Amino acid sequence: MRLISWNVNGLRAVMNKGFNDFFESIDADIFCIQETKLQEGQIEYKPDGYFVYWNSAVKKGYSGTAVFSKIEPKNVTYGINIEEHDHEGRVITLEFEKFYLVNCYTPNSQRELTRLEYRMKWENDFREYLKELNTKKPVILCGDLNVAQNEIDLKNPTSNRHNAGFTDEERGQMTNLLNAGFVDSFRYLYPDKAGIYSWWSYMFHARENNAGWRIDYFITSASIKEKIQDSKIHTEVFGSDHCPVELDIEL
């Protein structure tokens, strides 16, 4: 089974930059996107053979997630059932026979870390949500999780030491998640692979210089880690400041 996750930084914009070509060529069983920046009805995109689910933010042109699945889920939920977290369209959960698929766009802590305190509350509540799912059946979490966990996961760790996405607090929360029974699929397969990133700033020719961060993930329940076949980062795909990531797994 092939799963794709991509922060598209605005679905309408990326539609003009080869999104559909990649979507069709990769032929994913499940394709998740983050940062759609759409309200309901603003775009009609329903590829043949896919069930489509959208979760939009109340605020226009902001956040938002979507899932395209060849397999019809048993159930779909939007958000994590906590009101303060559920107005930004950040989470969609699809329940399948053998697993849960959770598509997430984690809140950014922002410059000057103005949202770090909220981010910590989000992390604690979201982790509890995932742990509860994991008691029922295995979980596959994907999305832009807005954190590079270790120094190997970004080009310039020293200069970014206290910046959003690489604070001790955010990194610690990723450690807490993994310690709660989950596995970072990419690092599980490639513990020492360096220089592979999924996001680059639009400034300072960052992508050209590969001055990036690995902040887009497929994280699975530890109970199914042996079923992971590959975890890929499609650095060759443009159209957004992020590139797609892929999980191949036999479930």
Language-model regions: role of each:
Residues 1-9, 98-110, 142:
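Active-site-proximal beta-strand elements of phosphoester/diester hydrolases
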Residues 1-47, 51, 57, 62-63, ...:
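N-terminal, active-site-proximal structural segment of metallo-dependent hydrolase catalytic domains
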